[in-house]
């Protein structure tokens, strides 16, 4: 067993700083009791922010983690999409030859006035640069590229994107959009669902890295999956999982592990209860496809290998 604080330092040293931020990816499973898990979750999130990552927390108690799109929606709700658009826009206008004179969000009219140039020509040059930087960046899925391009155009205030369309894009990213017809003008025709949610999630860390962040750190707390029986109705809070939902959640995690070659600049830390290793009905034994990918059948009884995909942590301090 590894001390929780020591493992956070290990993750930072071996993964967050020097590997993931250079284009790598990792999916780590951490087993801990409730007391240790809560502190570890906060500590690893703080370490991620200090290392330059955007951190998103997903809890199986409040998010339906057996659906990939719901994981993406929860992550998306914790992202400041407009801030990223402004960062990308400032880089684009500078590359087009019109660096923003102030720290405020550059708009087409203000830049045209400052540089004494025609608004239409400036808009054309910046649009061309945005197209090159975003729409032709094929490391991101097409719908994601279109959405980011439209958010940048909305920030530039050229009139190409209405406030209604801007709001619809944000709602679409967060899973709150009711009618897809609101995005016809943006040329986005599909909802984010099982068929494209994984690619949307994989596009996000690339977009973050493009805009100056180290990448994306996602902390997924799956301790709720171990709850077999729902409490009385008046005591229930959040999500509970049937046997089928449990297996679907494990399949989502299995897909993340198998997709690490496609994923870049992203670290996923999955926090689980000790029952993950001991409960035959709701633990790893229930889904061999996941167990075979992370379980260490041969290991030191007194000390875990911190490089392993599955690590047991506790409150005691053990040097790693």
Give the location of each predicted region.
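Pre-Walker A adenine-sensing motif
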Residues: 1-22
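A short linear-motif detector with a strong N-terminal bias
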Residues: 6-10, 34-38, 196-198, 247-250
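Generic hydrophobic, helix-prone segments enriched in Leu/Val/Ile
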Residues: 7-12, 85-88, 148, 290, ...
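P-loop NTPase nucleotide-binding core
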Residues: 20-211
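The catalytic "switch" region of P-loop NTPases
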Residues: 155-320
């Amino acid at each position: 067993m590894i001390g929780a604080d020591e493992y956070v330092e290990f993750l930072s040293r071996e993964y967050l700083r020097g590997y993931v931020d250079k284009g790598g990816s990792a999916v780590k499973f951490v087993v801990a009791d409730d007391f240790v898990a809560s502190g570890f979750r906060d500590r690893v999130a703080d370490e991620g922010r200090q290392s330059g990552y955007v951190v998103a927390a997903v809890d199986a108690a409040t998010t339906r983690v057996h659906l990939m799109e719901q994981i993406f929606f929860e992550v998306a709700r914790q992202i400041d999409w407009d801030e990223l658009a402004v960062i990308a826009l400032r880089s684009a206008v500078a590359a087009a030859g019109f660096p923003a004179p102030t720290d405020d969000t550059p708009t087409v009219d203000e830049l045209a006035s400052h540089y004494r140039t025609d608004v239409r020509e400036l808009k054309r040059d910046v649009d061309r640069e945005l197209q090159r930087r975003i729409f032709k960046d094929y490391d991101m899925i097409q719908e994601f590229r279109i959405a980011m391009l439209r958010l940048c155009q909305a920030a530039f205030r050229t009139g190409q994107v209405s406030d209604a369309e801007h709001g619809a894009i944000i709602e679409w990213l967060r899973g709150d959009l009711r009618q897809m017809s609101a995005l016809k003008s943006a040329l986005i025709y599909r909802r984010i669902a099982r068929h494209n949610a994984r690619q949307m999630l994989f596009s996000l860390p690339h977009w973050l890295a493009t805009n100056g962040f180290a990448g994306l750190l996602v902390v997924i707390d799956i301790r709720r999956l171990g709850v077999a029986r729902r409490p009385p109705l008046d005591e229930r809070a959040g999500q509970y999982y049937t046997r089928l939902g449990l297996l679907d959640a494990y399949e989502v995690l299995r897909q993340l592990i198998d997709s690490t070659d496609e994923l870049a600049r992203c670290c996923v830390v999955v926090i689980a209860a000790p029952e993950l290793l001991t409960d035959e009905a709701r633990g790893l034994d229930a889904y061999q496809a996941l167990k075979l990918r992370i379980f260490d059948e041969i290991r030191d009884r007194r000390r875990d290998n911190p490089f392993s995909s599955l690590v047991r942590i506790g409150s005691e301090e053990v040097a790693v």
